[in-house]
Amino acid sequence: MRVGPVRSAMSGASQPRGPALLFPATRGVPAKRLLDADDAAAVAAKCPRLSECSSPPDYLSPPGSPCSPQPPPAAPGAGGGSGSAPGPSRIADYLLLPLAEREHVSRALCIHTGRELRCKVFPIKHYQDKIRPYIQLPSHSNITGIVEVILGETKAYVFFEKDFGDMHSYVRSRKRLREEEAARLFKQIVSAVAHCHQSAIVLGDLKLRKFVFSTEERTQLRLESLEDTHIMKGEDDALSDKHGCPAYVSPEILNTTGTYSGKAADVWSLGVMLYTLLVGRYPFHDSDPSALFSKIRRGQFCIPEHISPKARCLIRSLLRREPSERLTAPEILLHPWFESVLEPGYIDSEIGTSDQIVPEYQEDSDISSFFC
């Protein structure tokens, strides 16, 4: 174990600051600097409780639709006119440009080298807890790492590698994926989740938006946004937290007043993700939250006929009502679907042009649906 230094942005000298955060030697310690002052910035928020959320739509809705989350109103004085997005700001050597499609995330451009990163801002008194999962996890190619931390008087600016869009937006634009591509990407998703579980971290609010592309070719994925994960003590993965996205929530979270297995709940979310990749919509959907949760509790869903038998088998192995009957994340990686789809010469079966494209979701009623 070692303690990361806090360096002054002006002098470069190490300075003590508050309780020390221990960094495991298994993962690189991010560089840290200290600012004299900092600008106001938004703080990443947890997903609301399920009881406070409306349901997600059937299909993956485009931005601006009634079923898409509306961006929060801009703070007074931020940006140009009323309701406009916050404008650029300068933090040390970086120019921060808020991303309209990624709440609480900014593009960070180094004014000296032109290097582009991503930046998140946290209150200074909470930032060590926020970045602790990144520090605890051993390095993994499918999990994002911290590049640098800059400390202001009241806020911490945490920098990550640049990405090329998230999986949710990608699936929405593609309608649904062929099995070969879905298998290649889903295997990376499961690999990241298995690595977290083996390192005593449960993700909790697991969904497609948390996976971003590492390359412009969109062939490599990595998991981001570990701030709201749960660090386990030993083998006990019992959770009582009810935060999450309605489309991905497991039956036991809805039925249990006490605790539930966090790892098993993550696996259910993986099942929702795989179904969505292959079908282009969620397995459980309804505009009424009560009806949606009732469908999830029953665990009944339909798989289109064009999905291969092995893919259907894997989906059903993940979306089991009984948590103990689900595969574990490491077991998913051994499922024969991956080998059968990714082997040379595999031909994806399609049953017709009309079945290859999932139509845009149409919502007649004017509801404010919570969407993750």
Curated annotation (Swiss-Prot):
GO cellular component: cytoplasm; cytosol; nucleus
Pfam families membership: Pkinase
Gene3D superfamilies assigned: Phosphorylase Kinase, domain 1, Transferase(Phosphotransferase) domain 1
Spans traversing the lipid bilayer: none
Residue intervals of the Protein kinase domain: 91-338
Family: Belongs to the protein kinase superfamily. CAMK Ser/Thr protein kinase family. Tribbles subfamily.
Entries under SUPFAM superfamilies matching the protein: Protein kinase-like (PK-like) (SSF56112)
An MF annotation (GO) of this entry: protein kinase inhibitor activity
Pro residues bias locations: 59-75
Keyword terms: Protein kinase inhibitor
Organism: Homo sapiens (Human)
Protein known as: Tribbles homolog 1
Tissue: Expressed in most human tissues with the highest levels in skeletal muscle, thyroid gland, pancreas, peripheral blood leukocytes, and bone marrow.
